[in-house]
Regions:
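Conserved structural core of kinase catalytic domains
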Residues: 1-26, 62
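Alpha-helical structural motif
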Residues: 3, 81-84, 88, 116, ...
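Conserved kinase catalytic-core helix
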Residues: 14-44, 48
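Short, polar/flexible loop-turn hinges at active-site or ligand-entry regions and domain interfaces
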Residues: 17-18, 71, 99-103
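Short, solvent-exposed segments of well-ordered alpha helices
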Residues: 20-23, 75, 79, 111
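Catalytic activation segment of kinase domains across protein kinase-like and atypical kinase folds
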Residues: 42, 48-98
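Regulatory N- and C-terminal appendages and interdomain linkers associated
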Residues: 98-197
Length: 197
């Protein structure tokens, strides 16, 4: 994948005392898993070793490169989602600890790295909720549509379609449903503005 990096190469260059850099890497991982799950893909071996990273604006975009254990379904059950998240948490923790040991970092750092791996699940759940929420608001609060779209764009998602539907028992209340595209909003926007690929 042109312009991408393996996580080990990135990790070896990141200052160990600045977790914000690792957080960007792990946010990309959470975004990738959300994308796969939205499309009915159970990864089965979500790990940093099976992932490449590229830049998308200020975000790191993650790409699946090892799909031997993946399965494609029309949609995933809560059990499948939870199982894939558990696999990811364990594999990411191991994937962070291994290069830390190679760099000779103190063993006390393992706890921090494990906590960072566990935080990927929180990021995943936040993204999942943002994509699947169907907020209800008053007819006069239509500005919230723009706020919802802007929030999804900030998370890196292009919004393909917005549907407003009255809540059945109160026509002054609207439910917003948003259909989002892939998580490449920033890269697409740069291409539109510059004409560069």
């Amino acid at each position: 994948l042109e312009g991408s990096w393996q996580y080990r190469r990135l990790f070896m260059r990141l200052p160990p005392d600045q977790p914000k850099h690792r957080a960007r890497l792990l946010d990309g991982m959470a975004g990738l898993l959300v994308e796969l799950h939205r499309h009915g893909v159970f990864w089965g071996d979500c790990s940093l070793a099976n992932t490449l990273f590229s830049r998308d604006g200020q975000l790191l975009q993650a790409w699946l490169v090892g799909a031997e254990t993946s399965e494609i379904h029309p949609s995933l059950s809560r059990g499948q989602l939870g199982h894939d998240l558990a696999i990811m948490t364990e594999n990411v923790a191991e994937g962070l600890i291994d290069p830390a040991e190679r760099l000779g970092l103190p063993e006390e750092m393992h706890e921090t790295l494990i906590a960072e791996a566990e935080h990927v699940q929180i990021t995943y759940e936040t993204l999942w909720q943002a994509l699947h929420a169907e907020p209800v608001f008053g007819f006069t609060d239509r500005y919230r549509v723009e706020g919802t779209v802007r929030r999804l764009n900030e998370l890196g998602f292009a919004v393909d379609e917005v549907t407003l539907a009255p809540v059945s028992d109160d026509p002054d209340q609207l439910r917003i449903r948003v259909a989002v595209g892939d998580r490449r909003y920033h890269a697409q926007r740069v291409q539109e503005l510059t004409g560069l690929n």
